[in-house]
A protein has these predicted regions:
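Conserved, mostly hydrophobic/aromatic
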Residues: 61, 133, 182, 231, ...
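Conserved beta-strand positions
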Residues: 63-66, 106-107, 135, 157, ...
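Substrate-binding cleft and catalytic face of glycoside hydrolase catalytic domains
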Residues: 1-119, 123
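Glycoside hydrolase catalytic-domain groove-lining segments
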Residues: 100-105, 125-169
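Carbohydrate-binding surface patches
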Residues: 247-286
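Active-site clefts of carbohydrate-active enzymes
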Residues: 68-69, 73, 110-117, 145-178, ...
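Aromatic/acidic polysaccharide-binding cleft in carbohydrate-active enzymes
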Residues: 157-232, 246-249
Length: 296
């Protein structure tokens, strides 16, 4: 309604439609009362403790999944001021008090509005409150710029894009490109929303999504999707301690490339050809050159 637009969201006149979200909530969905904030921080710690009793160790937490998503599924939108307040004044101190072994990351950052995320990180207290930053969806667009300005944080990707139940080659190419982008821009981890789905990939919320493995619920047969093999190109070779030397995003040439150096001192090249014809690719490694043909 016109009233809710005024009360809940900013005026978007003159704003670029490429921004997500197009409108920002100007009020925190979480009540900004110290009683609630303190209780919520304590809840995080109790959650960690409860899982420990079941012999499940939690090593990292983030304050909110997609604080800039106004959706039908459970969520909670926050303003920059609310995010700073809760993380700096409540969650970080309580975690350090009750569970100093658990690290706190700021995430999951799902907006491509650099000014909003920059406003949060520019608070001088943030660097002592959080150890790293987690990006997903539209947030990945501003990852390079944020990392350039704030190089002292650890970085991770927090949710691969789930697709629409196609389970096809194009979905695999999309994920391959995303991994190249996030790892190439300093993320030490890449995570998935769905490892396994059945049949048409319909989620519990009623929409179709993709997964690495597809199960036929009637026969019990398993299909490893093209996306599974796209991921395998990275995870069966890139081990802990591997460093990124250089990377190239997919461009007009339809090629993406990332060069690694393994702990054993070996070069590892992972490249993708997104075009419909085979292409030649040359990678220079010092005084040596690698020439290969990437099939379509």
């Amino acid at each position: 309604s016109p009233l809710s637009d005024v009360v809940l969201y900013e005026n978007t006149t003159g704003k670029d439609a490429a921004y997500y979200p197009k409108q920002l909530a100007v009020n925190d969905y979480f009540i900004q009362d110290s009683r609630y904030l303190k209780t919520y921080a304590n809840y995080f710690c109790r959650f960690v403790s409860a899982y420990r009793e079941e012999n499940i160790s939690i090593s990292r937490v983030m304050f909110q999944n997609e604080p800039w998503a106004y959706t039908i599924y459970p969520g909670c939108a926050w303003t920059p001021e609310g995010i700073i307040r809760f993380n700096v004044e409540y969650l970080a101190p309580e975690l350090k008090k009750q569970h100093p072994e658990v690290s706190l990351f700021l995430g999951t950052l799902n907006t491509n509005r650099f000014d909003v995320v920059d406003k949060i990180l520019s608070d001088s207290r943030m660097k002592d409150a959080v150890e790293g930053l987690g990006f997903q969806w539209w947030g990945g667009q501003i990852l390079p710029a944020i990392r350039k300005k704030y190089p002292y944080y650890k970085y991770m990707q927090t949710e691969s894009e789930c697709g629409s139940g196609t389970f096809d080659w194009k979905a695999a190419e999309h994920t391959f490109r995303l991994i190249n982008h996030y790892i190439g821009n300093g993320c030490e981890e890449y995570t998935f929303w769905n490892a396994i789905l059945s049949d048409e990939g319909k989620s519990s919320w009623g929409w179709k999504q993709n997964a690495l493995i597809r199960v036929d619920s009637k026969t019990g047969t398993i299909t490893y999707t093209p996306e599974y093999y796209a991921v395998k190109h990275f995870c069966n070779q890139v081990v802990s301690g591997t460093r990124v030397l250089q990377y190239k995003e997919k461009g007009e040439d339809n090629l993406s490339v990332i060069a690694f150096l393994t702990p054993e001192g070996k070069y590892l090249i992972v490249a993708g050809n997104y075009g419909d014809v085979a292409q030649q690719m040359t990678v220079q490694l010092g005084e040596k050159y690698l020439n290969v043909t990437l099939q379509a």
